[in-house]
């Protein structure tokens, strides 16, 4: 429980899936962690007056607006939290930084390299004035992932040789699932690659401390045309009078059996690529929304000369660890239950053995952001880190377009400096 009187007034743009996740975090964080400042959920913004008013009451915000520029310009806002589709990230974040607001922006940082470069450069400039920014890769805040990184940093795996990462979902397997914004390049930037592939790109670079330097990729769009929704919000849509809600597909035909108008899918459904990381590390990545039966299956495995560590999101309170330095008769994968008070973040929660879930990663993200802003430290992942992921996404896209040709990934710091 926070004992400080300092207040950080948060304004959030967007109220759907990520907006709800972030709201839960802002609402909870000071009730769990003792921090040098308190978050106040001051203002939420959305395009639809009735829906944003409902979200404000349901999620716990003091007030609501339909004008994000009003939110950014307000003297009563200290932090701007961007939870919108990728096509508006740059405009909102750049305006917020220019107004002297601290910014938390959902991943991927932007839809294009040029937008991401501008955001990273603006964030670096704003640092001199004490304005902080963070890109929202929430899986870094899973305690088991943070411990995984510590095992690598402590040398428990020896020389890192091989990385393999997958993120698999199946929510658009049905060809009648509607053409929601996540399936349109102008709104989302890319498909499975940017939506979920960005997570495993960031996680592997974070855990190993090594940058992806080159890639060879293939991408595929399995269903190229889909029914047009009458409207959509977050992960829900209305098609010809029928609501398709959450991450499930449903028959999009109307009650009278006719087929609604259709539109073209302009993003990838799946992306697979091999990569090199600094130091010659070999890596493989797969991101797919067509892995039938896989609802939200993220898995990262790191192989080294002295051992292996594995994280599986479906068992997010655990790590698998293989220690090759143990006597041959004792070797084998062991399970580490990451619920001890000594484990990252866990001392604020429950007694050992009592597990946490997906939503806690957002609470931990809010904790780290508040602490960084209140103590004058630059939080991570920074917008430069977000740009580095964007550069990998761009290289993967270009490689796939060029028949899987080997494509180098430039360093983000060089890009920002340029």
Predicted feature residues:
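N-terminal Rossmann-like dinucleotide-binding module
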Residues: 1-59
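C-terminal glycine/acidic-rich active-site capping loop/insertion
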Residues: 224-268, 272, 276-279, 306-380, ...
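Predominantly a Rossmann-like dinucleotide-binding segment in NAD(P)-dependent oxidoreductases
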Residues: 129-131, 139-265, 319, 403
């Amino acid at each position: 429980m926070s004992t400080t009187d300092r207040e950080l007034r948060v304004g959030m743009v967007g109220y759907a899936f990520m907006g709800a996740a972030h709201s839960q975090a802002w609402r909870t964080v000071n009730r769990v962690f003792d921090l040098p400042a308190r978050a106040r959920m001051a203002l939420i913004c959305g395009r639809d007056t009735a829906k944003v008013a409902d979200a404000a009451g349901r999620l716990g915000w003091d007030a609501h607006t339909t004008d994000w520029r009003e939110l950014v310009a307000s003297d009563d806002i200290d932090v701007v939290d961007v939870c919108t589709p990728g096509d508006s990230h740059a405009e909102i974040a750049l305006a917020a930084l220019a107004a002297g607001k601290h910014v938390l922006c959902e991943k991927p940082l932007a839809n294009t390299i040029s937008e991401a470069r501008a955001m990273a450069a603006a964030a670096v400039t704003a640092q001199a004035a004490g304005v902080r920014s963070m890109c929202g890769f929430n899986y870094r805040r899973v305690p088991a992932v943070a411990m995984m990184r510590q095992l690598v940093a402590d040398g428990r795996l020896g020389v890192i040789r091989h990385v393999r990462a997958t993120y698999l979902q199946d929510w658009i397997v049905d060809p009648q699932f509607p053409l929601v914004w996540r399936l349109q390049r102008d709104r989302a930037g890319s498909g499975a690659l940017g939506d979920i592939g960005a997570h495993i790109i960031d996680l592997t670079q974070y855990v190993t401390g090594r940058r992806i330097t080159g890639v060879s990729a293939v991408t595929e769009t399995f269903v190229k045309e889909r029914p047009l929704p009458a409207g959509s919000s977050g992960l829900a849509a209305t098609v010809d009078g029928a609501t398709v809600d959450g991450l499930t597909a449903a028959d999009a035909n109307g009650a009278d059996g006719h087929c609604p108008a259709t539109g073209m899918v302009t993003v990838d459904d799946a992306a697979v690529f091999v990569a090199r990381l600094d130091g010659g590390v070999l890596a493989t990545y797969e991101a797919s929304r067509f892995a039938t039966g896989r609802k939200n299956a993220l898995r990262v495995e790191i192989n080294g000369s002295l051992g292996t560590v594995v994280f599986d999101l479906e068992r997010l309170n655990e790590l698998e660890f293989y220690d090759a330095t143990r006597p041959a008769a004792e070797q084998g994968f062991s399970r580490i239950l990451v619920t001890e008070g000594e484990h990252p973040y866990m001392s604020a929660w429950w007694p050992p053995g009592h597990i946490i879930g997906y939503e806690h990663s957002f609470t931990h993200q809010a904790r780290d952001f508040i602490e960084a802003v209140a103590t004058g430290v630059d939080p991570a992942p920074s917008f430069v880190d977000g740009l580095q992921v964007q550069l990998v996404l761009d290289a993967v896209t270009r490689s796939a377009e060029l028949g899987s040709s080997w494509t180098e990934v430039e360093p983000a710091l060089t890009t920002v400096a340029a």
